[in-house]
Amino acid sequence: MMPRLLFRAWPRCPSLVLGAPSRPLSAVSGPDDYLQHSIVPTMHYQDSLPRLPIPKLEDTMKRYLNAQKPLLDDSQFRRTEALCKNFETGVGKELHAHLLAQDKQNKHTSYISGPWFDMYLTARDSIVLNFNPFMAFNPDPKSEYNDQLTRATNLTVSAVRFLKTLQAGLLEPEVFHLNPSKSDTDAFKRLIRFVPPSLSWYGAYLVNAYPLDMSQYFRLFNSTRIPRPNRDELFTDTKARHLLVLRKGHFYVFDVLDQDGNIVNPLEIQAHLKYILSDSSPVPEFPVAYLTSENRDVWAELRQKLIFDGNEETLKKVDSAVFCLCLDDFPMKDLIHLSHTMLHGDGTNRWFDKSFNLIVAEDGTAAVHFEHSWGDGVAVLRFFNEVFRDSTQTPAITPQSQPAATNSSASVETLSFNLSGALKAGITAAKEKFDTTVKTLSIDSIQFQRGGKEFLKKKQLSPDAVAQLAFQMAFLRQYGQTVATYESCSTAAFKHGRTETIRPASIFTKRCSEAFVRDPSKHSVGELQHMMAECSKYHGQLTKEAAMGQGFDRHLYALRYLATARGLNLPELYLDPAYQQMNHNILSTSTLNSPAVSLGGFAPVVPDGFGIAYAVHDDWIGCNVSSYSGRNAREFLHCVQKCLEDIFDALEGKAIKT
């Protein structure tokens, strides 16, 4: 049996906040072109990864109904139950059989991979706020290294070293170790590298090590989402050697790899970035970057206008760049300012379509903002961790380093766009939409300092289950109801796995929340503790099922996708208001833990929802929440704080304060 993996990914537009490392990071090499020199090739396990299972239809129906119970009244539930029975014995049975047959014919991938790419790429909403999340780096532990030029140079060099290490197959394979004393050793690595790739996964399995899918990694670099009518496309050009830099809405490119594929001298990179930082040009009257925040069909049409007006070569340089480095010209005021800056900014200094934007503010605060269609949080977090560690432990330059004496004006190309009247009007319209939308977004955060993972584990409770219970209690306290809740879980243990949904709202969390919020005096502390234990046990079961590909959301989505692809009328199950309500995720939650991350976040996935990024640390709990004007994030966090206080009081044997 495979392990209970607790890797979280991002929801439709996922999240994160600081926590403990999910895996030991691999050994670091010296300051050369490579981060690591793994003796096991990076993709050694990829061919032998197990395939993502398709759940039994009857199991999916049971799990779906269990998730609906806390959201529906008796009459609504009976209707949904009847629709499920009809679906299971009728059209659902036929679709499931077709899905199984299709899966057998496509053993190179997973049943969800194609539909999931389509889900992202056919979405016409702006990718800003609706999809793209961010994660912010912790400051460099050595304060003098947080100078903007120093940090931008070191992060850039480390990112390119990651690229080189990945391309050379020298990056340690991503492996989840249940018994690292046996599997995460030089002796095991020397042995497993001689096992053929077609069998290597089984060799790791024998020592309780579980390699994870790494198919998304090749889209990290040189990649851009290109807007097209109806369906966007992902573009990658692995031959490109240049970096794209944005500052004050201006575009610059220069090579970070030479003609032989070696990393350009870090002092030259430092010189080029210093040259860009010294450019005193004002923000353009019509910043082209706003276009990447538009509706995708609108942007596709405007992009064609850009090409028609002679900007094709300029766009190619933008699209093929190794990545986009954004140099902001202001410091961070506080965590709220940081979240707004890294999640959306002012729209002038991000190319939202790039696989990722590496953002460095004037005070050295840095973050990764990434486009979501190409990959999930697991791949980005690995890159994030390695770059943070490399840039802080083996920095390419020091604060005392002198930039190379090179002619940056010849090496750095400033890109310019020819803009017709129609394009200028398009940029103006995009700016107005962008400004209007981001003004409606509120973000706030709390740090609950009374305890965290260590205390909860002593009480034999799942830390994640307790955090999710607090969100259920808080929403009940604020709005008096239980609503559809989404927690993302990675299925990277399988070939081309993406994510599965954990549904944290259950009959157990509803009962427990009502006891705490509505009538705590009617229950003894022992009864409250027992209810929390039930919640924890059930949440653990849901988490295990999701990580093993045994949720219900992706299966039902794939069946719906197949029905549409076959030209069938949408089965009645999908027209049920209960189904639509469940997929209107008012509470969208995600957690990714890393010692490199200071904060992360994402916007709500529905207008009346919350985007909840959180982490349970050893001795505190962090939560970063976003909302639009229809909800109140600050008030919600006050309720979360109160609910966590109540939970900890009950666990300590104290009466709940009303």
Swiss-Prot record:
(R)-carnitine binds at Y486, S488, T499. It comes from the Eukaryota. It catalyses: (R)-carnitine + hexadecanoyl-CoA = O-hexadecanoyl-(R)-carnitine + CoA; octanoyl-CoA + (R)-carnitine = O-octanoyl-(R)-carnitine + CoA; decanoyl-CoA + (R)-carnitine = O-decanoyl-(R)-carnitine + CoA; dodecanoyl-CoA + (R)-carnitine = O-dodecanoyl-R-carnitine + CoA. It holds the Pfam family Carn_acyltransf. Gene3D superfamilies: 1.20.1280.180, Chloramphenicol acetyltransferase-like domain, Choline/Carnitine o-acyltransferase, Choline/Carnitine o-acyltransferase, domain 2. Its main location: mitochondrion. Residues 179-208 dip into the membrane without crossing it. One of its GO terms (cellular component) is mitochondrion. CoA binds at G452, K453, E454, F455, L456, K457, K458, K459, Q460, L461, S462, P463, D464. It is found in: Mitochondrion inner membrane. Involved in the intramitochondrial synthesis of acylcarnitines from accumulated acyl-CoA metabolites. Reconverts acylcarnitines back into the respective acyl-CoA esters that can then undergo beta-oxidation, an essential step for the mitochondrial uptake of long-chain fatty acids and their subsequent beta-oxidation in the mitochondrion. Active with medium (C8-C12) and long-chain (C14-C18) acyl-CoA esters. This is Carnitine O-palmitoyltransferase 2, mitochondrial.
